[in-house]
């Protein structure tokens, strides 16, 4: 066997490999010798088939099998001896000329092929003890709890029929049936019956609810409203529509005091217990947002400390996935690059930077996990699957079966668990300073942290 490195370009490597005909032949003979006790050929007793006859009958297929094994083992040796960590699957280029291929399969010539790969660069990890991050901390105030209780009351308040002839006011709940059209033509999803609408809740498209003020039971109105430009259904985004709307019930909100009796309707002993639960839920919510802030800050520090060339193929794959997502979202919302105050070229440049960052951070986190033996346990994966199953009541068995049969989906569950475990490991060594902030400061620019890696 001969190996010659022919390309060294950044992280790209290519090798010219020659497998000697003698090495190929000896392995073919060994494989045929294994087969002679297993094959059954007319005219020969078991185990007595001459090697020459076996070679005439099975030589080409066995040679192909041996070559596949030799190429795989040779490539593995090339990469292992050089300490390569592969970023991509090896790309193998075999002979294409018919005579050369025939000579190799006939056992009359060496096999010459090339193998090209892209490798992961050697990563020098920063000393995690030199990393400092701030942890924003929000104290749950009494006013926060009071606001939460108000929201709970609003979400659980009852309504009373206002009676015959009464008209709807802001805050009332009106049950309506409507038929929507655009330019006189009905559209999919534009008609419904028996839909409760709380005037002022903002759950319907802008302008719809306000035009219900003053409506009475049995009254029909033509409500004109325009779908937002970022509406989820692209075909409707920005379109002006008319809804022939009939009210079938008008109800006023009940006066629902936040007291012990109200708390009991929610299964709690008292208002104090409800406040305690609300405080705990807010504390958990703030802690979750704070965690994302800390994680983002830590990833920023890791990004700054590990500036290296990322494998171009991985960056391109990440960019393509990102770009498909962006284009799909823009299509569904009807937005354009112009409406987002950018251009396609500028957006692509920005998302290529994001893709490069994600790939580098992924490699860094993987390196940290490997060097510190951080692993995701089967129990952790099972808990993640259980959580997914709980989110789909009635389809739990289907969810379990899906993950049992889909290794790629399990890998997608493992990835964020692994990332969080590595982050926790680093934070144990880094300097984390708590910084008291307001609720508004905690949530400021929250969208920027949703793609932390």
Curated annotation (Swiss-Prot):
Catalysed conversion reaction: [protein]-peptidylproline (omega=180) = [protein]-peptidylproline (omega=0)
EC main group: isomerase
Alphabetical UniProt keywords: Cell cycle, Cell division, Chaperone, Cytoplasm, Isomerase, Rotamase
GO biological process: 'de novo' cotranslational protein folding; cell division; chaperone-mediated protein folding; protein transport; protein unfolding
Superkingdom, taxonomy of origin: Bacteria
Domain named PPIase FKBP-type: residues: 171-256
GO cellular component: cytoplasm
Subcellular location: Cytoplasm
One Pfam family, short name: FKBP_C
Molecular function, one GO term: ribosome binding
Disulfide bonds: none
InterPro entries according to UniProt: PPIase_dom_sf, PPIase_FKBP_dom, Trig_fac, Trigger_fac_C, Trigger_fac_C_sf, Trigger_fac_ribosome-bd_bac, Trigger_fac_ribosome-bd_sf, Trigger_fact/SurA_dom_sf
E.C. designation(s): 5.2.1.8
Protein family (similarity comment): Belongs to the FKBP-type PPIase family. Tig subfamily.
Task of the protein: Involved in protein export. Acts as a chaperone by maintaining the newly synthesized protein in an open conformation. Functions as a peptidyl-prolyl cis-trans isomerase.
Domain statement: Consists of 3 domains; the N-terminus binds the ribosome, the middle domain has PPIase activity, while the C-terminus has intrinsic chaperone activity on its own.
PANTHER family named among the record's database cross-references: TRIGGER FACTOR CHAPERONE AND PEPTIDYL-PROLYL CIS/TRANS ISOMERASE, TRIGGER FACTOR-LIKE PROTEIN TIG, CHLOROPLASTIC
Protein name: Trigger factor
Organism for this UniProt entry: Rhodopseudomonas palustris (strain BisA53)
Gene: tig
